[in-house]
UniProtKB/Swiss-Prot annotation:
Protein name according to UniProt: 1-(5-phosphoribosyl)-5-[(5-phosphoribosylamino)methylideneamino] imidazole-4-carboxamide isomerase
Broad class of the protein's primary localization: cytoplasm
Pathway: Amino-acid biosynthesis; L-histidine biosynthesis; L-histidine from 5-phospho-alpha-D-ribose 1-diphosphate: step 4/9
Gene Ontology terms, MF aspect: 1-(5-phosphoribosyl)-5-[(5-phosphoribosylamino)methylideneamino]imidazole-4-carboxamide isomerase activity
Catalytic activity: 1-(5-phospho-beta-D-ribosyl)-5-[(5-phospho-beta-D-ribosylamino)methylideneamino]imidazole-4-carboxamide = 5-[(5-phospho-1-deoxy-D-ribulos-1-ylimino)methylamino]-1-(5-phospho-beta-D-ribosyl)imidazole-4-carboxamide
GO cellular component: a single term: cytoplasm
GO biological process: L-histidine biosynthetic process; L-tryptophan biosynthetic process
């Protein structure tokens, strides 16, 4: 299995931002130079990037179609993108706008039956399921929903197995406790997922801070790693991560 580094840009109100643990009240802004940053990813040698519409993630209705198309045309990057995907029409529109792969988050928890149908319709290589998880006091990986204020009926393990058995290829998993914290990914979580669903291509997300974290993700047999804050704040250089 090849290993892919996904430099990431989260967009809110036209600006590149990062949220601490997904909290919209704890936002850091990095400017509105979205296309130049994407071009810099390509210039560094990246093949892919990860693009998140934070406005849509909150309110629904993907808003970055124009930006997505511009990035894809200008840079040649393959873009994995999502935020606010609520319907089949959303998926089709984002793919038509130039996405290589559409990320489906909360809907994948709320309505797995519908999303499994999309895997068959659009092709498993065109969709990534993104699951945000938090470990409870009993060590069970739960799936917080509705702005992380409630917990889904299904656990991470149950949903990962269900999707793996339904033909899913790409799973992006974020440990909420690590997101934006530069504290290192929770590699125990990813080792657990790899053992539970070895057929899935698991992407590491949340907490990456240095080359050792990239190397650890690769050594664990994960398919890729999403790099956000560490790149934006210069803790990690993309060229080095790509060469890792």
């Amino acid at each position: 299995m090849s290993f892919t580094v996904y430099p990431a840009l989260d967009i809110r109100n036209g600006r590149v931002v990062r949220l601490l643990q997904g909290d919209y009240a704890r936002e850091t802004q990095y400017g509105d130079d979205v296309l130049p940053r994407a071009q810099a990813f390509a210039d560094a040698g990246a093949q892919w990037m990860h693009l998140v519409d934070l406005d849509a993630a909150k309110a629904g209705g993907y808003t970055l179609a124009g930006t997505l198309g511009e990035i894809a045309r200008a840079t040649g990057l393959r873009v994995q993108t999502g935020g606010g995907v609520r319907s089949r029409e959303d998926v089709a529109r984002i793919l038509d706008a130039g996405a290589a792969r559409v990320v489906i988050g909360s809907l994948a928890v709320r309505n797995s039956e519908m999303v499994v149908g999309w895997l068959q319709e659009f092709g498993a290589d065109r969709l990534t399921i993104a699951l945000d998880t938090r470990q409870d006091a009993n060590g069970i990986w739960q799936l917080p929903v509705h702005g992380w204020t409630e917990t889904a009926d299904a656990t991470l393990d149950q949903l990962a197995v269900r999707y793996a058995q339904s033909g899913l290829q790409h799973l992006l998993c974020t440990d909420i406790a690590r997101d934006g914290m530069l504290s290192g990914p929770n590699m125990a979580l990813y080792a657990h997922l790899r053992a539970l669903t070895p057929q899935l291509q698991v992407q590491v997300s949340g907490g990456a801070r240095n080359l050792a974290d990239v190397a650890a993700a690769k050594a664990a047999g994960c398919a890729g790693i999403v790099l956000g804050k560490a790149l934006l704040e210069g803790h990690l250089h993309l060229e080095e991560a790509l060469a890792c």
